[in-house]
Structures are given as structure tokens and as C-alpha cells.
């Protein structure tokens, strides 16, 4: 027996050492957290608290199991998209239940909107001041709130007695979202309500259904993408993804649908087995385009990616142009109709905001506005990059290890610039690069401009309010724009990528438990 174990370790000692290294790193971080604010720690690893016990179980048992699942994937003939589910499902479930409701950005308002839709109220009602209001169960207001500081507080609110009382709750920003954005969450809430479940169960059902929809979309994105499969898988496993995936945020649908949409179009263009665009493909493209355009209007430029599909796969240039024009015009028209309806809820949230004057300023002073954009990007660049790499998760209070954040920045750059041996190598033509660049730039401009108009004071020298997660749905486009033949990466890195992402998420999970157990703003940095 011992000889077999010895041979097993000797056969792949480098990977074994890698796993032990990740385990040790995470255990050190847990130890630092524990010893910083708590007494009674045993340095030999025998922890007294449930926090330490759960952390050790996640690091050693779950981390070890998933790492060896990754190691044996080739031998067990597990496809990459299925391997993604093996890692994503347990990580997502942990994040779903160890992050208190409301501790994801804007989740309190997303929950109210989903509750309203589950009751059949697809369109908000405005009060005399123009605020969007809805009669929501009083327990929702008490239970799903971003003021929860710790698990004790969250548990107390979750176990409050059920009530039939309804109170008017405002959610102005959510009134701008089309009902489709909260359809998965609303479905989970509606089904559990049919079976007589209380508010707590309804809310977690909303999270779980939303999580399932996001997983299905990302699974199919990995399955369909003809190249850069490991990059897509890696991005889909980053903590910034799992920060919103198992929540009630509409960002789940936005991220999942954007990844799926890009992958599907690239599949139709570069997959040699796809000889023609079928009716099924046209239906899928049309529905996907309309959903993306309704998720957030700033992402509507993604629809120009339809232009990269070769005319030969439509049968003729005329057929391609007719279909593409109809789909794009339909998406724009649908957005204009929705914007025309919900514009009644466009109110100025902050002091000094004047949307009409701000639009006029941008149109009449384009050079000055470009300078404001450049100044903002330069000022917040580190914040954006760190945020996309795992800094300030949860409701901006959960911080991953600085080691993981720095490593993620480097690893993401390498995967963007290179190709893994064995992955399908595709020469991206100049037209695809151009369209991808146009879509990327247009979306970035819309993100900044929409917030500058609605959120920032008139002629403000910086654009505040832009969150790093806003860029995540389009991050893959950068790999289409830049030359991806600059590096040739050894195939063995694929195991490292998935193992790294697994332990990074476990680090975030333990940091989340630490944050909400002690109710403090933590730094899990190793200096």
C-alpha cells in the first residue's frame, strides 16, 4: 500500500507539491486571520473555533478533492466544460450560503425587484415624487439589507416570524431594469412560494435558480468556444464571477449571456463543422441579442459581433445583411421602447447632478470630455484591475490575499497573450479584431458616459461610480483584439490554472466567513 502511494507521488510529484503549496498558503492566511483578532490559537493547526475547522475542511478536503479531479480529468476523459461544473458547483454553493443575503452589491434592490416580478408586477409604479415603489413583504426589507454586519445578525433576521404585512419600498435604479434581468430569481421565488415556503427560503431559491442559469450559460460558452477554452474557463472561475453568480444580482445573467453570446458567434465563425447558419442558430442569435440588449443598454454594441460571421455560412451576402440588420434594429428598437417607458424613473440621485446639462456639455466639449475620460481611467486604473482580480468582494468588505490578487493579474495577462499547446490555434483576421475593438470601445464609452450623465455633478473632473465588474462581461474581447500568438504556453499549465482558481476561491470563501463571523472589515493580506 505504502509502495503504491510512494509510486503515485513519485509519478507526479510536481503537481502534488503544487497542491500542498496552495494548501499551505491558504492555511497560513487562515492562521494570520485567526491570530490577529482572536486568542487561543494552536500554531500546530488544531483550531478551536468553527471558523478554523470549516476553513481547514474547505482547504484540505474540498481543495484536495477538486485538485485531484483536475489532475485526473484527462485520464477520466472529462471534457473541460464538465470539469468546470465539478469545480464551479461546490464553490458556488459555498458562496451562496456563506455570503449573507444583501452582501453583494445592490442585492437588496435586486431582491425587491425579483420579489415584485414574482408577484406578477413586471412594471414599477411611480409615486408623486417620481420614485419607483412596490408593495413588498415587510420581512424582505428586514432580511435582505446591506447593513447586516455578521452571521448572528443575518441568522436573527432570517428566523424572524413570517408576516403578511406589506410595505412600500423604493428601488429607483432597479426600475430601469427590464423584467428579463430578474426572471430567474423571480422564478425561484415564485415556485417556492407556491409550496408555502417562507421569505428566507424564497430568497435563497432565487439565488440558486439564478446561479443555475449562470452556470448553464457559462458551461455552454466553454463548450462552444472554438479556441481559448482555458481562458474562458479561467475567467468563469475567478472570484469576481462567483461574487455575483450565486446571488440575486442581474449581473449573473449579464455575465453569463455575454460570455455565451461571444462564444456562440465565434463558434459559428471558426468551427469548420458549421457549414451553414440554421434556423436554430438564427433563433438562438436573435434571442441572445435581445436579452443582452435588455440586460443593460451599455452592452448593446456586442450585437455588432454578428458582422464577423462569414456570408458563406448564410448562403449569400444578401441573406447575411438582411438577418443582421433585422436583429440589430430589433435590439435597438426594443431598447428604445423600454427606455421610453422607464425614463419616468430617471431621477438625479446625487447633489449637483444635471443630466440635460451634462449631455450638452459632452456634445459641445468633446475634447474636454475625452480628457476627463483619460484622467478617470488613469486615476482608477489600479482599482479596476485589482477589482477584476478579486479585491473588495462581497459588499466591498471581503478582501482576498494580496498574493492571489497579484498572481491573478499576471496569470490573466499571460493567458490573454498566449496560446496553450493543444488548444485549437486560430488566426484571427483583421476584420474580427476591428469589430471586437469597436464593440469594446463603444461599451466602455457607454459605461463611463451613462454614469457621468446620471451619477456625477455637472462638469465633474472625474467620473465616479464605475465599478470594475462592469467591464467583466467584455473582458474576453481583449484577447480577440491583441495578438494572441505572442506566447506559447505548455499544456501542463491547464492543470495549474484550474487548481489555482479552486484554491483562490477557497481563500475568498474563508475570508468571507471570517468577515461575517467577526463582523469586521478585514485585510487577509500577507505583507
Where is each model-derived feature located?
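Start-transfer (signal-anchor) and selected internal transmembrane alpha helices
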Residues: 1-23, 45-93, 322-328, 428, ...
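Transmembrane helical bundles and short interhelical boundary loops of multi-pass, membrane-embedded
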Residues: 30-54, 339-353, 493-527
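Interfacial juxtamembrane loops and adjacent helix segments
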Residues: 119-205
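Transmembrane-helix signature of polytopic, membrane-embedded enzymes
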Residues: 197-200, 219-242
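Membrane-interface alpha helices of multi-pass inner-membrane proteins
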Residues: 243, 280-297, 302-308
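Short acidic/glycine- and proline-prone juxtamembrane loop motifs at membrane-interface regions
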Residues: 247-254
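Perimembrane helix-loop-helix junctions
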Residues: 266-277, 300-331
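Membrane-lumen/periplasm interface segments of multi-pass, membrane-embedded glycan/lipid transferases
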Residues: 336-422
